[in-house]
Design a protein with these regions (language model features):
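Conserved donor nucleotide-binding strand/loop of the catalytic core
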Residues: 65-78
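Acidic donor-binding/catalytic loop of UDP-sugar-dependent glycosyltransferases
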Residues: 79-85, 99-116
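N-terminal nucleotide-binding beta1-loop-alpha1 segment
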Residues: 1-17
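Conserved donor-nucleotide/metal-binding helix-loop-beta segment in metal-dependent transferases, i.e.
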Residues: 90, 106-134
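Anionic-ligand binding region
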Residues: 149-172
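A short, N-terminal amphipathic alpha-helix
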Residues: 30-47, 60, 66-67
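Conserved alpha/beta core of the MobA/IspD/sugar-nucleotide pyrophosphorylase nucleotidyltransferase superfamily
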Residues: 166-269
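Short aromatic/hydrophobic "clamp" motif used to bind/position activated sugar donors
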Residues: 95-96
Length: 270
């Protein structure tokens, strides 16, 4: 049986929205609400919050200790190194990458991707629901064997490969066997629905969703969110002008497998 380790990377020093992981969602921090959702999934194995050695992230370690969660501290800016070292420290054979800025992630989506990985009979090196994306932005799940992560950790040289952990892998389809888990409904909301957090408007959106759904149903899922947005279009509009904005926009000249249709600039960048 493979030792599966899910690594959630979190730090307080966000450049666009400082301390976003400690913002309040229904009486707990955003990080806690997000990790609670990850832990609702059936197949996540050992869950580790990987924060940095920066003193300001002592608070993240304290939160993890209070909740009885695993915490690893590593490189502040080389996320590939931090991810690899965390997986190594917990004896991982299979490594799952879930970012900490997706507090609306659906545990059922996490399980769907992990079941694809665990039930594969053919060789694979990387399975995600991101390449290409079809799910609402903010349901990011990536899985790779430890030897593949080790190859990336050893060989990746570009700054964006170190910062974003997995581009070295999915940018090399000629070398690695890549598989993608699409939304079974046949929809593509990857550029139209934004459930991640980088800007104050994202926080307003996520806070509104939590306040509407969490008190009655802490295990609310993707369909619950979509039904809420249909009934309350004013919530959907809160961060709509950022829909489709992601880190790809700053690296289109470097990324071979990403097209301009898979990203957009913010209004002030256009």
């Amino acid at each position: 049986m493979s030792q599966l380790t899910t690594v959630v990377q979190a730090r307080r020093g966000s450049s666009r929205l400082p301390d976003k992981v400690c913002m309040d969602l229904c009486g707990s921090t955003l990080l806690e609400r997000m990790v609670e959702r990850v832990l609702m999934a059936k197949h996540v194995g050992t869950v580790v919050v990987a924060t940095t050695t920066d003193p300001q992230d002592n608070l993240i370690q304290s939160i993890c200790e209070q909740r009885g969660w695993n915490c690893f501290r590593g490189h502040p800016t080389d996320l590939l190194d931090r991810h690899y070292q965390a997986a190594l420290a917990y004896g991982a054979d299979l490594v799952v990458k879930i970012p900490s800025d997706v507090p609306l992630i659906d545990p059922a989506v996490v399980d769907l991707v992990l079941e694809q990985a665990l039930n594969q009979t053919e060789k694979w090196d990387y399975i995600s629901n991101l390449h290409p994306g079809t799910w609402p932005d903010g349901n990011d799940v990536e899985v790779m064997p430890m030897d593949v992560l080790h190859a990336a950790w050893t060989e990746a040289r570009l700054p964006m490969e170190r910062e974003h952990t997995t581009p070295f892998i999915w940018e090399r389809p000629e070398r690695f066997v890549l598989k993608n888990v699409v939304w079974p409904l046949g929809l593509d909301y990857s550029m139209s629905h934004r459930f991640t957090i980088d800007y104050p408007e994202d926080y307003a959106f996520i806070k509104a969703v939590y306040e509407a759904l969490w008190p009655q149903n802490p295990t609310f899922g993707l369909q619950d969110i979509l039904h809420l947005l249909q009934r309350n279009p004013e919530i959907f509009q809160l961060n709509q002008h950022y829909a489709g904005v992601n880190w790809y926009r700053n690296h289109l000249n470097e990324l071979k497998t990403i097209s301009v249709q898979q990203t957009k600039k913010t209004t002030h960048e256009s």
